[in-house]
Regions:
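Formylglycine-dependent sulfatase
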Residues: 1-180
């Protein structure tokens, strides 16, 4: 289970009064927690490729976003692919590799199909209400300050749909003998 973009606002990392994270805090007590994990590159795509391959961006030659890793590294075995190759179910729910937000919400983006046993691409009302995104450069969402004050419940948003699906999958996996 990997989560990103949390900053140190979660309770288990010191917290912030506005962030209520009891479930993440409980998970952190039971699992591994990386407190000195640093970004390998100041862009999303190279950092994510580095995390999944174990290679520095200068080794992989992935220095920009919107790169399919197999074009640069056709024979690389990613972390999730290694688990999959050793009998684990490696399921991706939402974004792991780079994709443009909000444009690519609900599709594979720049994913690596060889890395996964199963995938799920959630698409919530935050995608269908894309026109409501405020951006300092209208219509440009990456590389500029932009946000959406989304209406609706958590379960209607892309992240809420992903969290609900993850819970369902974890319950399903717990009933099998296959590691996940």
């Amino acid at each position: 289970l990997a989560v990103d973009d949390l900053n140190d606002w979660v309770g288990c990392l010191g917290g912030h009064p506005q962030a209520k994270t009891p479930h993440i805090d409980r998970l952190a007590k039971r699992g591994g927690r990386f407190e000195r994990a640093y970004c390998q590159y100041p862009l999303c795509g190279p950092s994510r490729a580095s995390f999944m391959t174990g290679m520095y961006p200068d080794q992989s030659l992935i220095h920009r976003n919107a790169i399919l890793i197999r074009k640069h590294l056709p024979d690389v075995v990613t972390m999730s692919q290694h688990f999959k190759n050793h009998g684990y179910d490696a399921t991706r729910i939402g974004k792991i590799y780079h994709y443009n937000v909000p444009k690519d919400i609900g599709n594979d983006g720049h994913d690596d199909p060889a890395s996964w046993s199963h995938t799920f691409n959630p698409r919530g009302r935050d995608k269908t209400e894309e026109a409501k995104v405020f951006s300092l450069r209208p219509g440009s969402y990456g590389g500029t300050l932009s946000w959406l004050a989304a209406d609706g419940t958590d379960e209607e948003q892309t992240d809420g749909i992903a969290a609900t699906e993850a819970g369902k999958r974890l319950e399903q996996f717990a009933k099998t003998k296959q590691p996940f």
